[in-house]
């Protein structure tokens, strides 16, 4: 099952730490209660001001807040409007979330072709979650003709960025010779890498 649960992606992914805009940073601070009292309404206001300056991270944040109903009434139509603005300006996170909406049929008719199109654009801009999910779409023939070699290619890209889900897939593909030549040594390498990452997170 493709991992496109937007609510899970809000925290730590939607609002990256290294955003340049001070207005955006102010909104992020209010969203998380970082140095100030947590206040979603003030966060939304700051994001709206940042969006007026052309901040695409802010546009994406506003879109998701409307869709998930954080600090504002739930409004898929308005949320999609903001996501579309950012996605059409080649913002990889917005493209990914928009693809997720089409994949899940949230606020729009379910459309796997459009989901694949947006997620592919995001993946090709090196957005990690899009790369993993694009691999899943290739593996399962969702929105695209099933292609295990392409699935392997994108899983490997994401695995090298320490996506544990992708590493599990790559280990399995090497073990069984799925989408690539069977290679037990490489399978064991990735299984070992997964254990190393688990140890680092403890």
Name the predicted role of every residue range.
Residues 32-34, 52-55, 68-70, 75, ...:
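Short helix-capping/linker turns of helical repeat alpha-solenoids
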